[in-house]
Amino acid sequence: MYMQVETRTSTRLHLKRAPGIRSWSLLVGILSTGLAAAYYSGDSLGWKLFYVTGCLFVAVQNLEDWEEAIFNKNTGKVILKTFSLYKKLLTLLRAGHDQVVVLLKDIQDVNVEEEKVRYFGKGYMVVLRFATGFSHPLTQSAVMGRRSDVEAIAKLITSFLELHRLESPSERSQSSDSEPDGPGGQS
């Protein structure tokens, strides 16, 4: 699953993502290798601690981040939060939380983009496009699997932000601006 809907009201949409089963399986597998190396080796205690610590470090490095997106119409902001256990351990608990705050009115479009995932094929992610020309992914990593899960989240965000309804009046005003003046407008 790409992201789970935590809460959904007319003014607030809260999406969450936690590390998936692949990520946890990789953590257990790498950590088990370190524990097995320490248990079955005849090395000193220092080396055994090195095996376990090294494998724990590599395992946590490969763990996906916890991510959440909060769209709030009352404040007019989107808050994208990321929590990384690896950064938290690496900086000795000083960092690990990243946060991006964007105004809702700056979001022009929501797209699904395809990204190559090394060794595994294709992954998909939702990208927010802003009026300034910049774009920002909803999550930091692409999800492998079905594109339909990611498209469902993109449609949910689009309907919550009413992006397609906002385009219709502007299209009408552009078409009325391009129409030739009537008989009263000519001199």
From Swiss-Prot:
Transmembrane stretches, start-end: 20-42
Positions where Phosphoserine occurs in the chain: S168, S170
Quaternary structure and interacting proteins, as annotated: Interacts with CYBB; CYBC1 may act as a chaperone stabilizing Cytochrome b-245 heterodimer.
Native source organism of the sequence: Mus musculus (Mouse)
Effect of deleting the gene: Mutants are highly susceptible to Salmonella and Listeria infection and are impaired in their ability to control replication of either pathogen. Mutant neutrophiles have a highly impaired superoxide burst. Mice are very susceptible to Listeria monocytogenes and die within 5 days of infection, fail to form neutrophil extracellular traps but are resistant to melanoma metastasis.
An example Gene Ontology biological process: innate immune response
GO CC list: endoplasmic reticulum; endoplasmic reticulum membrane
Membrane topology field: Single-pass membrane protein
Keyword rRNA-binding set for record: no
InterPro entries according to UniProt: Cybc1
Family in the record: Belongs to the CYBC1 family.
Keywords: Chaperone, Endoplasmic reticulum, Immunity, Innate immunity, Membrane, Phosphoprotein, Transmembrane, Transmembrane helix
This protein's encoding gene: Cybc1
Region (Disordered): 167-187
Chief location bin: endoplasmic reticulum
Name by which UniProt lists this protein: Cytochrome b-245 chaperone 1
Role, per record: Functions as a chaperone necessary for a stable expression of the CYBA and CYBB subunits of the cytochrome b-245 heterodimer. Controls the phagocyte respiratory burst and is essential for innate immunity.
Protein localization: Endoplasmic reticulum membrane
